[in-house]
Amino acid sequence: MKVAVLGAAGGIGQALALLLKTQLPSGSELSLYDIAPVTPGVAVDLSHIPTAVKIKGYSGEDAKPALAGADIVLISAGVARKPGMDRSDLFNVNAGIVRNLVEQIAVTCPKACIGIITNPVNTTVAIAAEVLKKAGVYDKNKLFGVTTLDIIRSNTFVAELKGKQPQDINVPVIGGHSGVTILPLLSQVPGISFSEQEVADLTKRIQNAGTEVVEAKAGGGSATLSMGQAAARFGLSLVRALQGESGVVECAYVESDGKHARFFAQPVLLGKDGVVERKDIGTLSAFEQNALSSMLDTLKQDIELGETFIKN
């Protein structure tokens, strides 16, 4: 099993690479790529960790050597948020980066599962899909927007509020991966009930958690370590599913049946070929139904922005 991390010299990429080096199954290969010249050194640094995971780093304009033979590609390359920016401010820079990298994936490892971490995810996933489609290699079951950070934040915040163990909580989060498009389904957390005020406050905190980190870092970065952990969790779930483990379910932003929007975050069952089943989002509370209806225009605009970027 070969996993490639693109953007491996950045804050998310280094955290992700560290977690994969320590947690990938024995015999796996880990390939690190970044435009920054430090990348081969990041790989050498990680190579000293005593796990049976082969690691190599590549830098420069050409990502193809890093991508050769990859089963999974995780893309975290791009610029990070600064205070006062929202995820859409990142679009102008990150759209071109994602397009360029996905074009190289399309020719080098077109059958790989691709996890997009680079924000704005609502838009960058649509960009990736259009690039792959143009190249004639698009498989909607193998392209994912990694929204796992929304899930781990939800689990953490609910556990804090209710005095529970975070690993025992599983909050499904649907919609998209920015602002109002992030919708935690708190009504579906088994064995825990919330007041209306708690639901409103938690939902808002989960939606604004990225900004909470950006402001707390006072201009020194965005959520890199928690995002690295979230991306590693998603990547390792994909590895397990590709290797034949059954019953692996994660929430992810995928091309859906189009009922809500072309791309939609929802629980998906993973298997040997990527998504095996897009699971039903279940019955929503009145609060959730209202939040879903009012976010769809924003989500659709985000998606259209990505589609148009490639088509024009």
From Swiss-Prot:
Q: Known catalysed reaction(s)?
A: (S)-malate + NAD(+) = oxaloacetate + NADH + H(+)
Q: Where is substrate bound in this sequence?
A: R81, R87, N119, R153
EC number per UniProt: 1.1.1.37
Where is NAD(+) annotated to bind?
G7, A8, A9, G10, G11, I12, G13, D34, N94, I117, T118, N119, M227
The annotated active site, in chain numbering, is: H177
Q: Per UniProt, which keywords does this protein have?
A: NAD, Oxidoreductase, Tricarboxylic acid cycle
Q: Name one GO cellular component term.
A: cytoplasm
Q: Which GO terms describe its molecular function?
A: L-malate dehydrogenase (NAD+) activity
Q: List the Pfam families hit by this protein, alphabetically.
A: Ldh_1_C (PF02866), Ldh_1_N (PF00056)
Which PROSITE patterns has this protein been placed in?
Answer: MDH
One GO biological process from the UniProt record?
Answer: tricarboxylic acid cycle
Q: What does this protein do?
A: Catalyzes the reversible oxidation of malate to oxaloacetate.
What does the subunit comment say? Homodimer.
State the family named in the UniProt similarity comment for this chain: Belongs to the LDH/MDH superfamily. MDH type 1 family.
Indicate what this protein is called per its UniProt record: Malate dehydrogenase
State the organism of origin: Pectobacterium carotovorum subsp. carotovorum (strain PC1)
